[in-house]
Amino acid sequence: MTNSAVATPSQTNPFDARGPFLLSLFMTLVGYSVLVALPAINGAWVDQLGFSEVEVNRVASSDLLGLFIGAVLTSFLIRSWSRQNLTYLGIALSIVANGLCTQYVDYETTLILRFVAGLGAGFYTAVAVASLGAHSKPREAFNWMLLAFAISQFLELQLIPHLSMNGIYLFFIATYVVTLPFVRLIPTTNPPTAAQDTPTESRRPTLLAWVGIGAIVVAYINIGAYWSNIELAAEAAGLDGNWAAQVIAWCVLLSFGGCFTAMWVLKKFDYDRPLLFTFVLMVLAVGLLAFNFTAAVFVFSVAMFNFLWIFIDVYQMGGVSVADRSGSAAAFIPGAQGLGQTVGPFAASLMLERGWGFDGVFVLCALASATALLIYTLIYFTCRHRPVV
């Protein structure tokens, strides 16, 4: 038998404990709260603050750019700084920025404040995701996270349309405040390398963790552009805005199906081929809207998008964490998502500004998914003869 890294009682993984695990789950929901509710928040910025379609895409990009930078900084600092201190820093920035958003409503100031709020969310969320990635079974941990994510997304999309703009900002503040007493539960040490119950030589090369990070960036260009514009595109196509918002909210429940399907597939099949097939379906789901935006196609696209998004996330996030147990790559995941979500809405705003319309936006979405498909296809053919964790 080869030298296996088998956990011993003296090497108990503190990130497997119930308290830190549940706190990390909740923190990811808080940190991603802007991301999951973008359709409703963008609608509020348009309806309540009078921002244009171009401006809301840029405000969303600013928020998610902050998320990216905060997560990148955390990925470098997490080995030398206390995870608890990084979390407190994220909470402070987010509370201050969201509080100031209630006082300043002009476009330029909102653009800056959303960046600062996103920066705080980046520190906060990166710690949470890295803590889940440090779990001894990271794919299962991320599956539970995404299951909770689906519930949170549905509830937010039901709640936020009924809030004033200030109410939305105060809601975000409250979610950070309630975690303050529990930050002390975050482990201050790194996970033991022995927490992974697979032989060292069977682990995927760390380089693949960073290739996976790049693939997440590309995949989230699709998610950012699609999720920021789908409700606005439905209204532009002549569909009733309230009906479209309800379709989006209820289709989020299909994320549950994505989670449970991912759990079942993990037990029955390998990692790569289901992911490749899922990306093929994603290209079709988002690309159809560029050619035929009817009510039926809209419902089909939103339903498929929500099912496939979560399914893809389970594999992407779990794969990165399995490939790199140090936590640096896992801490970078929110940054990768934030970067993709920054590029997506910003590129969409440029397309709309130049008169390419929402058709061009959905072509962008399809191309981004196709590029991610190509990356994972190359990984598959490169690594298919290697043992997979």
PLM region descriptions:
Residues H135, A141-T188:
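Helix-loop-helix hairpin linking two adjacent transmembrane segments in secondary transporters
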Residues I69-V105:
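Conserved MFS/SLC helix-loop-helix module at the cytosolic interface between two early adjacent transmembrane helices
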Residues A97, E108-A117, A296-M304:
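Paired small-residue
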Residues F269-Q316:
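C-terminal transmembrane helical hairpin of 12-TM major facilitator-type secondary transporters
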Residues G122-S136, I310-D324:
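Intracellular juxtamembrane helix-capping segments at the cytosolic ends
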